[in-house]
Design a protein with these regions (language model features):
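Short, well-structured alpha-helical segments in soluble
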Residues: 41-53
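Adenosine-phosphate binding glycine-rich loop
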Residues: 181-234
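A glycine-rich, Thr/Ser-enriched phosphate-binding loop motif common to dinucleotide/cofactor-binding enzymes
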Residues: 75-92
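Electropositive, gly/pro-rich neighborhoods at or near active sites that engage anionic ligands
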Residues: 31-41, 56-70
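Glycine-rich phosphate/diphosphate-binding loop of Rossmann-like nucleotide-binding domains
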Residues: 98-162
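Short, charged/polar "capping" segments at the starts of alpha-helices
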Residues: 13, 63-69, 116-120, 139-145, ...
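N-terminal basic/disordered segments at the start of proteins
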Residues: 1-24
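Short, well-ordered secondary-structure micro-motifs within conserved domains or adaptor modules
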Residues: 1-7, 157-192
Length: 234
């Protein structure tokens, strides 16, 4: 599925200009739209992108006119699967930001069922943290048994009496914790986190997280290349 980009047009230009580009080796169709971005102008660009097979677009940080783009058939690059795949790095960054050593931390993974992302997160976090709690009605017991076989230590079941230092939610949950990171949904809010590449710089004319998600889902990004930072304290 082709990905597009909405970008600010050149100064003194009155026309919307379309051009194929490569962003970190990913092909995109870029629409440069002169400011101010009035709804009619955005719709015109969106319709032209749709005719070229574009359904999802990258936009500048702070873009607030999704209703206009969606009315023309364009949507965002969803980031949920990418964020859940990066849950171990997010968890460790959150603990570091809260000045909690992982080897002394209790972390709970919560979801309606054990997904691939939850299982992989549990396998990576279990040897890193003191206690790993699993809260998943479907598949939770099986995952705990797998962790016991793999690491020889129990992965505990989440319970009201236990107060984890950090809770990672893979689906909407009412469970508590000293710190909660909600990774559920198509586009989880990651206000306290930032993602960067170890050896490359992300372009400044589009939001970084959707770009990373697009690179990851198209197989152009090794998760080992990504670092996660946070100012998450509560």
């Amino acid at each position: 599925m082709r990905i597009g980009q909405i970008a600010v047009g050149r100064k003194r230009s009155l026309r919307i200009q379309f051009s194929p580009k490569r962003v970190l080796d990913m092909p995109i169709l870029r629409a440069e739209i002169p400011e101010p971005w009035r709804p009619r102008r955005l719709r015109r660009a969106a319709r032209a992108l749709r005719k070229q097979g574009v359904k999802r677009v990258l936009v500048p940080a702070g873009f607030a006119q999704w209703d206009t783009l969606e009315s023309a058939g364009l949507g965002p690059v969803e980031t949920g699967e990418f964020c859940r795949a990066r849950a171990p790095a997010v968890a460790l960054a959150a603990l570091t930001g809260a000045h909690i050593r992982p080897e002394g931390a209790t972390v709970v993974l919560r979801g309606e069922r054990v997904t691939r992302a939850m299982r992989m997160s549990a396998l990576k976090l279990c040897p890193e943290v003191k206690n790993l709690l699993i809260a998943a009605p479907v598949g939770g017991a099986g995952l705990q048994a797998e962790l016991r076989r793999e690491y020889g230590v129990p992965a505990l079941e989440d319970a009201p009496g236990r107060a984890p230092d950090l809770a990672i939610h893979f689906a909407p949950s009412a469970g508590g914790g000293a710190r909660i990171v909600d990774l559920s949904g198509n586009n989880p809010r990651m206000d306290h986190f930032s993602f960067a590449l170890r050896e490359q710089t992300l372009p400044e004319d589009c939001e970084g997280l959707p770009l990373l998600a697009a690179l990851w889902e198209t197989g152009r990004l090794d998760p080992a290349e990504i670092t996660v930072f946070t100012d998450f304290h509560s």
